[in-house]
A protein has these predicted regions:
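PLD/PLD-like phosphodiesterase catalytic module centered on the HKD motif
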Residues: 2-357
Length: 357
C-alpha cells in the first residue's frame, strides 16, 4: 500500500513538473525566458570536444559548456515534448530530411521555407525553438524520434534561439510559420489536437499553406516575461533576403552577418549603412576558432547599438527563392559578445569598419 501510494505521488509530481515545463530550460534545468546558443564545430578547439556558448535573459556574458545529451537545452525541449503527458500540442519542422534510416526521405521542396524548429504549447505556456541544425530532431523509420543531437552536429557551427511564450502568442507564431510555409517533417498526431484548436495550428498540421499574404511581414512577438522579439518574415515569392535591406533600414545601422557560405556568400553592401559578411570567428578567448567554411549558423549583429538577430536564412543568392524568418531583439551584452567574436569580415573600400560608427 505504501509503495503504491509512493508511485501515485511520484506520478502526480512528474505530471505537475511536465505541465510546468512548457518553457525554455537552461543547462541546469531551470526555467528561463529565452536563450541563445552557439554550438561550435568539434574541431574548432585543441581538445576536440563538442561545446557550446550559452546566453539567456539573465546573462552578462557567454557561458561555455561541454555538450552532454542530458543537459543540452534544446535536447530538453524535445525530451519533454515527447513525454507521456498528452495535455499539449507540438509541431516540428525542418527543411532537410529528418529520417535517419529511410532512403526515401527527401529534403523539402524549394517552395517550402528554409527553416528548422519546434513549437510546443499547453493550455498556458509555449516554447518556440528556432535552430539551424539539419536532421534535428532525428526520426527513425519505425517512427521513433531521437532526442539527442544527430551525428552531423559537430561538423559545422550552429545556432539555437529559444523563446518562452504564452499559449496565445504561440498561435501568432503558428500563423507566421504558415506564412513562410514551413515543411511539416514531424507532425503532431491529430488525436492530440482538440478539434476546436486554433486554426493556424490546424493548418500547420494539415500542411495547408495560404498564399494570401504580403511578400514580407514584420511582427513583434512578446516573450512570457514581456521582451520584444521582432520577426522579419519573407515569403518564397519575395526575391530579397532581409539581411540585404530590411535590417539596415529598420535599425539605421550597419550589420555583420554570419551564415552558411555555400555555394557562395552574397556580396557585401557598401552603402552608407553597410552589410558585411563575417569570415572568421573566435569564441572564449580564441579557444574556439573557425572560418566560414565550417559555419552553418545564421546570425547577425548591428555594428552599433545592441541588435542581435538569429535566422532561418543564409546570406546567399539561393535563399532569395525561400521563405523564412530573421528574429531580432536588443541585448547589450550579447551584442558585445557577438561583435567580439568577429576576427575578420568583409571590408568596404575607402570606408571605416562598420563597428567604428
Amino acid at each position: 500500500m505504501q509503495n503504491t501510494l509512493r508511485c501515485v505521488l511520484l506520478s502526480l509530481l512528474l505530471s505537475f513538473s511536465l505541465s510546468l515545463n512548457r518553457v525554455c530550460l537552461n543547462p541546469e534545468g531551470n526555467e528561463v525566458d529565452w536563450y541563445a546558443i552557439f554550438l561550435y564545430p568539434q574541431n574548432s578547439s585543441k581538445e576536440g570536444i563538442l561545446s557550446y556558448g550559452y546566453f539567456d535573459a539573465s546573462s552578462t556574458s557567454l557561458k561555455y559548456y561541454a555538450y552532454t545529451e542530458e543537459t543540452f537545452p534544446p535536447n530538453r525541449v524535445t525530451k519533454y515534448t515527447l513525454s507521456p503527458d498528452t495535455d499539449y500540442n507540438f509541431f516540428f519542422w525542418n527543411d532537410d530530411k529528418t529520417c535517419k534510416d529511410d532512403t526515401e526521405s527527401k529534403s523539402a521542396s524549394s517552395s517550402k521555407a528554409h527553416a528548422k524548429g519546434e513549437l510546443i504549447m499547453d493550455k498556458d505556456n509555449g516554447v518556440f525553438l528556432q535552430h539551424s541544425l539539419p536532421r534535428f530532431p532525428t526520426r527513425m523509420k519505425n517512427g521513433e524520434i531521437l532526442t539527442e543531437l544527430p551525428g552531423n552536429a559537430g561538423i559545422y557551427g550552429q545556432t539555437f534561439l529559444c523563446i518562452s511564450v504564452e499559449t496565445q502568442t504561440s498561435y501568432e507564431i503558428a500563423e507566421l510559420l504558415n506564412y513562410i510555409n514551413v515543411s511539416n517533417n514531424l507532425s503532431v498526431t491529430k488525436d492530440r489536437v482538440n478539434p476546436t484548436e486554433n486554426e493556424w495550428i490546424r493548418k500547420l498540421i494539415d500542411n495547408k499553406y495560404s498564399s494570401k499574404y504580403p511578400l514580407t511581414k514584420e511582427t513583434v512577438i512578446k516573450s512570457k516575461d514581456g521582451k520584444d522579439f521582432t520577426f522579419f518574415s519573407k515569403s518564397h515569392r519575395q526575391k530579397d533576403v532581409p539581411y540585404d535591406t530590411t535590417l539596415r533600414q529598420k535599425y539605421g545601422t550597419s550589420f555583420f552577418v554570419r551564415t552558411w557560405s555555400r555555394p557562395s556568400l552574397s556580396p557585401m553592401i557598401c552603402e552608407d549603412k553597410q552589410l558585411l559578411n563575417v569570415l572568421d570567428v573566435a569564441f572564449d578567448n580564441k579557444k574556439f576558432t573557425y572560418g566560414k567554411d565550417k559555419e552553418h549558423s545564421k546570425w547577425a549583429v548591428s555594428a552599433s547599438g545592441n541588435i542581435c538577430c538569429f535566422g532561418d536564412l543564409n546570406h546567399t543568392d539561393s535563399q532569395k527563392n525561400r521563405g523564412g524568418h530573421i528574429v531580432c531583439f536588443e541585448n547589450e551584452n550579447l551584442a558585445k559578445e557577438m561583435r567580439g567574436a568577429i576576427v575578420t569580415s568583409d571590408l568596404c573600400p575607402n570606408k571605416f569598419l562598420a563597428f567604428m560608427e
